[in-house]
Structures are given as C-alpha cells and as structure tokens.
Amino acid sequence: MDCLPDDLLVQILYLLPTKEAVSTSVLSKRWRTLFTRSDNLDFHDPISGRPEDILKSFNDFVDSSLAFQGGKHIKKFSLHTKIKTFEYHVLDRWICNALEHGVSELHLHLMHESWPWLFSIPSKVFNSSTLVKLSLGSRLYCPSFPPDTSLPALKVLLLDSILFRDDQLSNVFLAACPALEDLTIHHTYHPCVISSKSIKKLSLSVNSGYYGAGYILTLDTPSVVDLYYSDSPRHNAPLFHLDSLAKVTLDLHFIENNNREVQNDADVKNLIREICNVKTLHLTCSTVEVISVYCKGGLPMFNNLVELVFSSKKEGWRVLLPLLLENSPNLETLVLSDLHRYTFGRRHRFVGIPIPPNNQIKVLRIMQYQGSATVLKHISHFLLNMDCLEVMKVNVAAALDDPKKMQLTEDLLKLPTASCKLKIQVL
C-alpha cells in the first residue's frame, strides 16, 4: 500500500473505526500522522461493566482523537457505547466538540448501563446548522426539546427506540427540520402522529405487540413517495395522508403471543385501501399471510400498479396472487420469491397459478431458483400465459455450482413461450 498516494490512503482510513485507523500510525514514519487527516471519527465500545482503568482509557482515547482534529472540519462522528449516570458530562463534551467542528453526520447509539430509558439525549444535538444526517438510539428518552431547536440542514434522520412526550416528535422535532427527506423509525410503541411536509422516504417499524393494539397511527406526510411499513394487525387501521405515494413495502406480521382477540378485531382492509393507488408494491411472506386472513372478502383494484414483488407460502400462491393479478390490469413487472413453497402432493396433479388472459406483464423475475421440477412447471405455465413478456430474469440460488447452473439454464431455454420477443437471463 506504500505505493498509493496519501489522499487515497486517507480515504481508506475513513472506512475504518477510529481505533483501527490510529493503530496504523506505528507502521512507518509516513503513516504516523495520516490518521489525523481523516474527517471520520468512529468510536465503538459496547462493553458494559468495564473496569475503571479501561473506561478511563476509552474516554482518554476519544478526547485525544478530538484534540487531534484541531480546527479541522469533522464530517462524521459515530459513538456506540453504554454509559453510566456520572458519564453524562463526558458525553456532552464529546458531542459539543463534534458540533463545534461543524459535523455533518452524527450517529449516537447510546444506552444506560443499568436503566434503559433513563438517559436523556443531550439538548445540544437539537440545534445545529451543519447536521445533514442524524442517528439516535437506543432506548433513550426525550422529555422535551430546547426552545431553540433547529436543524435546518438535516436531510436524513434515524430514530431507534426513542421515547418522546405527547406529540413532540412531530410538533417540535420534525417541525424544526424543514429540509428532512428520509425518516426511519424503529420503536416498541406507536408514535401516534408523524407529520412532515418535506419527507419523501419513510420507514416505520413498530413492534408493540398486544400493548400497542389500541393506538391509532396517523401519517400526515403528503410528500412521501417511498414507504416501508412493518407492524402487526391493529384494531384501527392507520390513517394515511400520503398524496404522493408511489412505492410501498408492507411487512405485516401476527402478534407474537398469538392473542386471537386482538387478531380477530384487526382492520387490514382499510390499510390496503390506503395504498391501492401505488405504482410499486412489495408484499413480504408474512404480509401475504396476514392479508389472506383478513381480506377474504376481496381486494380493491390496483389500477396504477406496474410492479409487484410477491412472496408466500402455499395459500398465498393459490388464492392471493391470482386475485392481485386480476385486480392489477396495468401490471408490467412481476417479481416472485419462494415459489418453491407452492408444491403439490404426489396424489395431486399440477395446477398452474391463474394468469389473466389480458395481462400486460413484460418483465418476470424468479428469485432463488434451485431447479425443482415443480418450479420449472410454474415457470413454463407463466411463459405460456404471458403474451407480452419481453424479459424473464431468473436468479439461481448462490449455493448451486456452475455445472448445475448450466443445466438449469439449458432447461429454461428449452421451455415453449407465448411471446416471440422473450429474452431469458439466468443470473
């Protein structure tokens, strides 16, 4: 590596945790100060119950690394550690130091060593004119925001198990982020209201189980184009104000304790109605199970849908996929995962998935193909019933060796097709 220019070596050091970057200083005289030119500081010390000497060593290392920066700009500051109550002032000092250096990316993964939810986020985090990316976690409490809360440049925000009081998440925090475009929230409890006019990409994962069943989630985010939503079925469907929504990934799952009272009262139909105008829809395997249980009366039309990503066990292939295909007259791209799960017993003859005769599907993609005879029959059925098909992409399982992949490719190329334009790609 000695033949590489200094600027390239600094870029390589940027990708390393700070402790490893500093360790390169002993390699040679040339390397002695290279690490000080990196504008990325990444401190990872998740060990709990540390002896005092090790704790002091870590704290001194962070202090000295910040001191090395002098008056230079810090692009990225990451801190992953468990803390004690008496360490709050130390943490405040580090964060203030990073902010004073004009940090643009701040990633804090902090947890109180004894009492989760006890530690409050330092108020200095909420007033910065330079922050563009901010990550906060995990199991932290934010009782209030400072009166001068302002993050005018913030574009990307990740909140991992952050507890806010009342509606301060939207009314104060998000309101102070006028440039925010990408919001990710992972939480054990429902944030009741998420409101922002600027967000374009929203990822929301909730794992509240039975105790969150009564919450009503409201998304007032009219500029969101791309939504990822992971949750359990609820008594009350979420209320969406998503005028610009084009892409949705649904990851619904049954409550882990299998409380039938909650599940029987869940409202999934209204959730599906809220997203029926999207152009791209991704349904996970567990989502298909949930929809199959709660939407037996039918589905709305998906007139704008052009791309569907679908994964399921046996029931979903037999019932839900045909219904989705029937209700999506403008579908052009179909991506199928776990097709090998749709099998038939020895005493049952093969029955292909019903394909609407007027379908407009142009691209078919089969994921994790292993070459089973049943899946090959399904693929053959698709090719004979998709007249507009132009491209079929088959992703073979990574575990297959090259001779097996060649055999699978030959088998696929021999299949008869209804479309004269079809090109088959084995990936």
From Swiss-Prot:
**Cross-referenced InterPro entries:** F-box-like_dom_sf, F-box_AtFBL13-like, F-box_dom, FBD, FBL60-like, LRR_FXL15/At3g58940/PEG3-like
Q: Where is the F-box domain?
A: 1-46
Q: Which Gene3D superfamilies match?
A: 1.20.1280.50
This protein is called Putative F-box protein At3g44060
Q: Which organism is it from?
A: Arabidopsis thaliana (Mouse-ear cress)
